[in-house]
Amino acid sequence: ALVPLRLLLDHAAENG
């Protein structure tokens, strides 16, 4: 569950 969450957060962080 940590894998998908981290991926989503990474994308959101890049988007700003």
From Swiss-Prot:
It comes from the Bacteria. GO terms for molecular function: fructose-bisphosphate aldolase activity; metal ion binding. Keywords: Glycolysis, Lyase, Metal-binding, Zinc. Coiled coil: none annotated. Binds 2 Zn(2+) ions per subunit. One is catalytic and the other provides a structural contribution. One of its GO terms (biological process) is glycolytic process. The keyword Lipoprotein does not apply. It catalyses: beta-D-fructose 1,6-bisphosphate = D-glyceraldehyde 3-phosphate + dihydroxyacetone phosphate. Its EC number is 4.1.2.13. Pathway: Carbohydrate degradation; glycolysis; D-glyceraldehyde 3-phosphate and glycerone phosphate from D-glucose: step 4/4. Its cofactor is Zn(2+). Homodimer. Catalyzes the aldol condensation of dihydroxyacetone phosphate (DHAP or glycerone-phosphate) with glyceraldehyde 3-phosphate (G3P) to form fructose 1,6-bisphosphate (FBP) in gluconeogenesis and the reverse reaction in glycolysis. Belongs to the class II fructose-bisphosphate aldolase family. This is Fructose-bisphosphate aldolase. It comes from Anabaena sp. (strain L31).
